[in-house]
Amino acid sequence: MFKKVDKKASREKRHLRVRKKVFGTAERPRLSVFKSEKNIYAQVIDDINGVTLVAASSLEKDFAAKGGNKEGAKLVGELVAKKAIEKGIDVVVFDRGGYIYHGRIQELAQAAREAGLKF
């Protein structure tokens, strides 16, 4: 018989493997992404001090019906980049959170790059 693959557990294992290598500092913080079925979240984190510097999500007021789809991810990417640049952060390390670089994750990353973040 075939075992059923637990996708969430696989993603969490991938995320731990990636997190061993991806580390955010004050000069180059980590842009972390999390997605649920209905929403997408992004935050810029300084891992040395354990502080979230900037955060944006599709739950904010500007996102009426564009929650967790590609358009919503693009808006979240633009918003997190805009907030980061306002705080003087222009270079980050991208942490895809164990997700495949495809779809909503890719849209968020491309929008953040177009808005001025470098990674």
From Swiss-Prot:
Q: Per the similarity annotation, which family is this?
A: Belongs to the universal ribosomal protein uL18 family.
Please state what the protein is called. Answer: Large ribosomal subunit protein uL18
Taxonomic superkingdom: Bacteria
Alphabetized, the UniProt keywords read: Ribonucleoprotein, Ribosomal protein, RNA-binding, rRNA-binding
Biological process, per Gene Ontology = translation
Please tell me the species this chain comes from. Answer: Clostridium beijerinckii (strain ATCC 51743 / NCIMB 8052)
Q: What Pfam families does UniProt report for this protein, alphabetically?
A: Ribosomal_L18p (PF00861)
Disulphide bridges: none
- Subunit and interaction comment: Part of the 50S ribosomal subunit; part of the 5S rRNA/L5/L18/L25 subcomplex. Contacts the 5S and 23S rRNAs.
Entry GO MF terms: 5S rRNA binding; structural constituent of ribosome
- HAMAP family in the record: Ribosomal_uL18_B
Give me the Gene Ontology terms describing cellular component.
cytosolic large ribosomal subunit
